[in-house]
């Protein structure tokens, strides 16, 4: 069974490995991700609005 110190060492070793593999996105990639995220947020909001309006029409409250 691993001790707390060994668990921490393993965690930081895995963290370091992940950080070495990752890279900073370019401006084009960042803009695309921001657009997709924004569109997703708007769609989720619109779906919630439609559900709320349907509920309002059904209950009449």
Curated annotation (Swiss-Prot):
<keyword id="KW-0472">Membrane</keyword>
<dbReference type="GO" id="GO:0009306">
    <property type="term" value="P:protein secretion"/>
</dbReference>
<dbReference type="GO" id="GO:0005886">
    <property type="term" value="C:plasma membrane"/>
</dbReference>
<dbReference type="InterPro" id="IPR001901">
    <property type="entry name" value="Translocase_SecE/Sec61-g"/>
</dbReference>
<keyword id="KW-0813">Transport</keyword>
<keyword id="KW-1003">Cell membrane</keyword>
<comment type="similarity">
    <text>Belongs to the SecE/SEC61-gamma family.</text>
</comment>
<dbReference type="InterPro" id="IPR023391">
    <property type="entry name" value="Prot_translocase_SecE_dom_sf"/>
</dbReference>
<keyword id="KW-0653">Protein transport</keyword>
<dbReference type="Pfam" id="PF00584">
    <property type="entry name" value="SecE"/>
</dbReference>
<keyword id="KW-0812">Transmembrane</keyword>
<feature type="transmembrane region" description="Helical">
    <location>
        <begin position="38"/>
        <end position="58"/>
    </location>
</feature>
<dbReference type="GO" id="GO:0065002">
    <property type="term" value="P:intracellular protein transmembrane transport"/>
</dbReference>
<comment type="subunit">
    <text>Component of the Sec protein translocase complex. Heterotrimer consisting of SecY (alpha), SecG (beta) and SecE (gamma) subunits. The heterotrimers can form oligomers, although 1 heterotrimer is thought to be able to translocate proteins. Interacts with the ribosome. May interact with SecDF, and other proteins may be involved.</text>
</comment>
<dbReference type="GO" id="GO:0006605">
    <property type="term" value="P:protein targeting"/>
</dbReference>
<keyword id="KW-1133">Transmembrane helix</keyword>
<keyword id="KW-0811">Translocation</keyword>
<protein>
    <recommendedName>
        <fullName>Protein translocase subunit SecE</fullName>
    </recommendedName>
</protein>
<comment type="function">
    <text>Essential subunit of the Sec protein translocation channel SecYEG. Clamps together the 2 halves of SecY. May contact the channel plug during translocation.</text>
</comment>
<dbReference type="GO" id="GO:0008320">
    <property type="term" value="F:protein transmembrane transporter activity"/>
</dbReference>
<dbReference type="InterPro" id="IPR008158">
    <property type="entry name" value="Translocase_Sec61-g"/>
</dbReference>
């Amino acid at each position: 069974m691993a001790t707390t110190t060994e668990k921490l060492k393993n965690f930081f070793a895995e963290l370091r490995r992940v950080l070495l593999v990752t890279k900073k996105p370019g401006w084009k990639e960042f803009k695309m991700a921001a657009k997709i995220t924004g569109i997703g947020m708007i769609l989720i909001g619109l779906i919630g609005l439609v559900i709320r309006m349907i509920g309002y029409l059904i209950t009449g409250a």
